[in-house]
Amino acid sequence: MTHPGALTPLVKAASAYYRTAGRFARHFAYVKLTHDPAFAAVLAHGVLAGRERLLDLGCGQGLLAAWLLAAHACHTQAAPGAWPARWPPPPLLHSYCGIEINAREVARARRAFALDPGAAVQFVHGDIRDLDYPPADAVVILDVLHYLDYTAQERVLRRVRTALPPQGLLLMRIADAAGGAGFVLGKALDRTVVLLRRRRWVPLRCRALADWQALLGHCGFSARALPMAGGTPFVNVLLRAEVA
């Protein structure tokens, strides 16, 4: 994985979107994009190459949109170090739709992109279990499905499969429940964050990696795991699931 220091220009460019969204939003963006290996992995592996219409389920304050737009800007710059030399070109988004159940996160996202009318992004407040999904070439679900019960998890995945065209892509991050101590640590951290943000207990419905892959196959996808630990102690896995 690319050293975090090499990503400083990209992280700064993405975090700059949040200068109008408040100090917390901008600081959170900078820390999250610097230390969470999922964002770098998406670009380093080129998993969204050629995907122009993106649907982000459980988008939070829109970090993925900021990351991808900043990536395109950095890639087109001539300045040395603006883009990691070994990375493939980033995707060029024609449209991005993020759906988020937390109204405060949606408000931050909308404020962040309000000064960039050229960015083809929209943020919808609602529940991914209920809202209609717009047309997309790729759907991204990062650290979201384990907040839903098992029946809802499958229902969302089947709806995603129906919404995607042939050769469509689903990109998911999950925690491998068979990962031993790393999983226990990650789950404890997740529960703490949820309690701090939501002020209530939320049950987590996790699965082992093999069970996630089996479920995806049952829902019409062919999935493979991508390396993503990035030096962290957790057992998170990025799943690249193509329409079978």
Regions found by a protein language model. Name each.
Residues 2-45, 61-132, 151, 171-244:
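Class I (Rossmann-like) S-adenosyl-L-methionine-dependent methyltransferase catalytic domain
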Residues 47-49, 165:
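Short conserved AdoMet
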Residues 52-60:
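Conserved class I S-adenosyl-L-methionine
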Residues 136-137:
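Local beta-strand N-terminus motif with an aromatic residue
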Residues 140:
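A conserved beta-strand element that flanks and buttresses the S-adenosyl-L-methionine
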Residues 143-144:
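Short catalytic micro-motifs in class I SAM-dependent methyltransferases
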Residues 154-166:
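A short glycine-rich, Lys/Arg-flanked "PGG" loop and its adjoining helix->strand segment in the class I
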